[in-house]
UniProtKB/Swiss-Prot annotation:
Residues modified as N-acetylserine: 2
Function summary: Component of the ribosome, a large ribonucleoprotein complex responsible for the synthesis of proteins in the cell. The small ribosomal subunit (SSU) binds messenger RNAs (mRNAs) and translates the encoded message by selecting cognate aminoacyl-transfer RNA (tRNA) molecules. The large subunit (LSU) contains the ribosomal catalytic site termed the peptidyl transferase center (PTC), which catalyzes the formation of peptide bonds, thereby polymerizing the amino acids delivered by tRNAs into a polypeptide chain.
Keywords: Acetylation, Cytoplasm, Isopeptide bond, Nucleus, Phosphoprotein, Ribonucleoprotein, Ribosomal protein, Ribosome biogenesis, rRNA processing, Ubl conjugation
Protein source organism: Saccharomyces cerevisiae (strain ATCC 204508 / S288c) (Baker's yeast)
Miscellaneous note of the record: Present with 43500 molecules/cell in log phase SD medium. There are 2 genes for eS7 in yeast.
Protein localization: Cytoplasm; Nucleus, Nucleolus
Family in the record: Belongs to the eukaryotic ribosomal protein eS7 family.
Gene name per UniProt: RPS7B
Cellular component aspect of the GO annotation: cytosol; cytosolic small ribosomal subunit; nucleolus; small-subunit processome
GO MF term set: structural constituent of ribosome
Main location: cytoplasm
BP terms from Gene Ontology: cytoplasmic translation; ribosomal small subunit biogenesis; ribosome biogenesis; rRNA processing
Residues in coiled coil: none
Protein name stated in the entry: Small ribosomal subunit protein eS7B
């Protein structure tokens, strides 16, 4: 059990976090090609978010420095985790912190870095969410009531890997940031 605890950086892990950590350890022991890559990886926390159609999305929050290591094995790891947890889409996101905007009344000790601003964190969440695919364009549509809908255009070369998850991406992004978003994969007509 101590090896399961070592995969989770949380003090009091939930039942779902323990199940995912156990799956990580099972994958380490069963597949030799993933063993070296999975050993140093840890999870900060996991959230389960409801998506339309009775599906759920498992959002695994990982430390920011470990994100590049996760990207190396993300396609294989996602496939294996989705086999173990059916009817759930697995999404890896880095745990990022947003610092409040400095005001006149608050004492400013250090200048707020660009990477900790709300806009930068939301853009990085979007990039992490659609990782194997690249974002090729963004459009903002303003509705009559003043609401905004962001349209994100994804690269069409990875349609098979990502097409079935687009609704999950929309629900997760809306839940985490409060912004409405629509994903679109433009068709290649040459």
């Amino acid at each position: 059990m101590s090896s399961v605890q070592s995969k989770i950086l949380s003090q009091a892990p939930s039942e779902l976090e323990l199940q995912v950590a156990k799956t990580f350890i099972d994958l380490e022991s069963s597949s030799p090609e993933l063993k070296a890559d999975l050993r140093p990886l840890q999870i900060k926390s996991i959230r389960e978010i409801d998506v339309t159609g009775g599906k759920k999305a498992l959002v695994l929050f990982v430390p920011v420095p470990a994100l590049s290591a996760y990207h190396k094995v993300q396609t294989k790891l996602t496939r294996e985790l989705e086999k173990k947890f059916p009817d759930r889409h697995v999404i890896f996101l880095a745990e990022r912190r947003i610092l409040p905007k400095p005001s006149r009344t608050s004492r400013q000790v250090q200048k707020r870095p660009r990477s900790r601003t709300l806009t930068a964190v939301h853009d990085k969440v979007l990039e992490d969410m659609v990782f194997p695919t690249e974002i090729v364009g963004k459009r903002v549509r303003y509705l009559v009531g003043g609401n905004k809908i962001q349209k994100v255009l994804l690269d069409s070369k990875d349609v098979q890997q990502i097409d079935y998850k687009l609704e999950s991406f929309q629900a997760v992004y809306n839940k985490l940031t409060g912004k409405q978003i629509v994903f679109e994969i433009p068709s290649q007509t040459n």
